[in-house]
Amino acid sequence: MTQATTRSFAAYQLLLESSTTTGTFVAPCGLTERSVQFTKDLSDTNVPDCDNEDAASWTQRDVVSKSVRISGQGVMALESEPRWRAAYESDQPVNVRINKTGNKAAGGGYWLGQFHLSSFEDGATKGNKVTKTIEMQSTGPVVWTDAAA
């Protein structure tokens, strides 16, 4: 039996552009879960059969828009708190890079786009560490770049 080749948690990174150094991306510490959801909004059109108008029509779908949503949760390092707060307080989007480590043959590369921090939540339970939950929504294109061969 051949096992599937997989990626570790650390090999799937969420990086925010530094607020002080343009073009430098930094992974905020503390997220123990993260996910990226790619969606398309579709428009449905029922297209009839011209030879048999009584037959059920088939639905055809056209892409109207695309969007990417990032979510994450975990404990938040105090060192990461100022960057998240700055991203929320700003009315401008943040440049975000989503890294998948590995070479091109292994599916490595990254997505790059601008995102608004749309949700920023702290939580606390007695006896546990303070938690952080975030959600980011893309604005404009999110472009994939293959890793080097």
Give the ranges of each region predicted by the language model:
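Viral virion structural and adsorption modules
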Residues: 1-6, 141-149
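Solvent-exposed edge beta-strands and adjacent loop segments
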Residues: 2-73, 114-133
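Generic structural motif
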Residues: 19, 41-45, 75-81, 101-104, ...
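Residues within well-ordered beta-strands of beta-sheet-rich folds
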Residues: 71-73, 95-97, 135-137
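Short, acidic/charged, Gly/Pro-enriched secondary-structure junctions
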Residues: 75-118
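Intrinsically disordered, low-complexity acidic/polar segments
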Residues: 81-83, 105, 126, 143-146
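Short solvent-exposed strand/turn elements
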Residues: 130-144
